[in-house]
Amino acid sequence: MDTKTHSLPITHTQLHSNSRPQSRSQCTCTHHCQTFSQSCRQSQRGSRSRSSSQSPATHQNPTGAHSSSGCQSQSPNASPPPKRHKKTMNSHHSPTRPTILHSSCPKNRKNLEGKLNKKKMAKRIQQVYKTKKRSSGRKSN
């Protein structure tokens, strides 16, 4: 078995000589991650370094970070924060749809209120049904 296992690494290293530099690049990657985490820690300590630490973060996540920063720099920046506040005010129902409909069409408010009332009534009916089951179960015992 020693001869077989010994012969395999020799052929493997001869065929794939790039495997060693890959391991080295991983070491540099972990070193880069360590330095990046240190910069994040420093940014948490000082508020001035936060702006400088955000720019490397955008380079690492180009799809998410650049799109969000692009939206923030445009004029619609004023409209999303009020929507977020409205979302927090709405309780459990899907917050995105009511905010859009409330702002666009006042006629749809009545429809939404009716739907919400129906949901509330359905919950009440279920609660009443459960309590009746419980009370009937207690009587039979």
From Swiss-Prot:
Question: Its biological function?
Answer: Plays a key role in the replacement of histones to protamine in the elongating spermatids of mammals. In condensing spermatids, loaded onto the nucleosomes, where it promotes the recruitment and processing of protamines, which are responsible for histone eviction.
Its tissue distribution reads:
Testis.
GO terms, biological process:
acrosome reaction; penetration of zona pellucida; positive regulation of protein processing; sperm DNA condensation
- Mark out the compositionally biased spans (Basic residues): 130-141
Instruction: Keyword check for Nucleus, yes or no.
Output: yes
**Cellular component per GO?**
nucleolus; nucleosome
Q: Which family does it belong to?
A: Belongs to the nuclear transition protein 2 family.
Its taxonomic path starts at: Eukaryota, Metazoa, Chordata, Craniata, Vertebrata
What organism, scientifically named, is this protein from?
Macaca fascicularis
Gene name on record? TNP2
Q: Where is this region: Disordered?
A: 1-141
Q: Which Pfam families match?
A: TP2
Molecular function GO labels:
DNA binding; zinc ion binding
In its UniProt entry, what is this protein called? Answer: Nuclear transition protein 2
Query: Where in or outside the cell is it found?
Result: Nucleus; Nucleus, Nucleolus; Chromosome
